Amino acid sequence: MSDGTRKRPHVWLALGLLAILPGLAFAGAGKEPKDPWALMMLRFEFDNDTFIGSDDVFTAGWSVQLHSRVMDRWNRGYSGWIGKVPGLGDDGEGGRVVRWAYGLSQIILTPSDISIETPQPDDVPWAGTLGLTGSWWSNDNRKLAALQIYLGCLGPCSHAEQVQKFVHEDLGFGEPPKGWGNQLSNRMLANLNYEYRYKLYAVDVEAYVPGRFAHDLSIGGQAAVGNLLTSVTGQIEFRFGWGLTMGFTKIPDPPGLGIVMEPIYFDPKAPLVDLYHWRIYFNLVARSRWITYFAPAEGGATESGYHHPALDSYPGEHQILFGLHLVRVPFGMHVTYYRYVGSEPPGIQGSIDWINFSFEYRF
């Protein structure tokens, strides 16, 4: 084993997960399949930049999510208010599908040099967020609308310090972080996000099955309002592969910065075909985001008493995402690379690119 590999145990972790997942998918092959319309989903997402040789700015993030089964109409608890949000209605029995998801998430941000104990006013602040989300969406194979509510906190209440120290020091996955005494102080966070997407081009429905190549093209936009993020985003997404699902791209933005959902589509009027076969497909997303407020970038009071200045500009306004999706019900794995386009904003010393790993189990 080389010294470089010893210093990067996350490489072995990633390879282990890639090796284990196919075996897990076959483990339940002999069991009687459950009604596909009754399947709920548990998803775990892990975000990190060390997989691309960096460990700063957006250092890490994770979320655990519970997604509802696929429904073709809202139940009484949601129809009276979610169903009245523009685009989020259902068409009654046999129309669009609707779903909800709830999640818990954490984000960790650090300066480029985590070995420095003193304040670093010329770099990203030490900061962490912890939040709960509720998401609701309605879609078919042509259009999608989604709404999300985020409630959380920024500061020591996020326990980002304890999590990073446990991973770096107790597990030995990185250099001991020494500057958490300078993290941004506690503040409450709340955000409301709304998204709409529309498919410009889609192949015939018969092509959305395992073993057949399919592709489609969509555009969309998202608006976020709150004291975590206030922004407007526009995007274009291209999907292609073998066994492409109907619906839209799964974009694994950290909850609050994006919307937690599973935007696939099943036609309620048609039987599900080959649900339990392998699907492998890809997506390419280009988007631009106009940001007017992002809590960690605003600086502010810190636990050591100094005032961290705001960043000169907001990071991550122009992005290209490339995703790989491997699914065989009840398991799924998704890998998405976030590539930020353009020069890095002043005040950011390190790279802001990162990778998301998502693991799913339907039950």
Regions found by a protein language model. Name each.
Residues L42-N48, W100-I108, I149-G155, Y196, ...:
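Transmembrane beta-barrel strands of outer-membrane/channel proteins
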Residues P36-W81, G332:
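N-terminal ordered "arm"
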Residues D56-W62, W126-L130, A145, N186-L192, ...:
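Residues that define the transmembrane beta-barrel architecture of outer-membrane proteins
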Residues V85-V163:
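Long, hydrophobic/aromatic-enriched structural stretches that serve as scaffold segments
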Residues M1-D35:
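Cleavable N-terminal export/targeting peptides
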Residues S112-S115, E237, G243-F363:
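Outer membrane beta-barrel transmembrane domains
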Residues G28-L39, V70-V98, N139-A146, L200-L217, ...:
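Short loop/turn motifs that connect adjacent beta-strands in outer-membrane beta-barrel proteins
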Residues P121-D123, A160-E169, E175-R187, A224-G226, ...:
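Extracellular/periplasm-exposed beta-strand and loop segments of Gram-negative cell-envelope proteins
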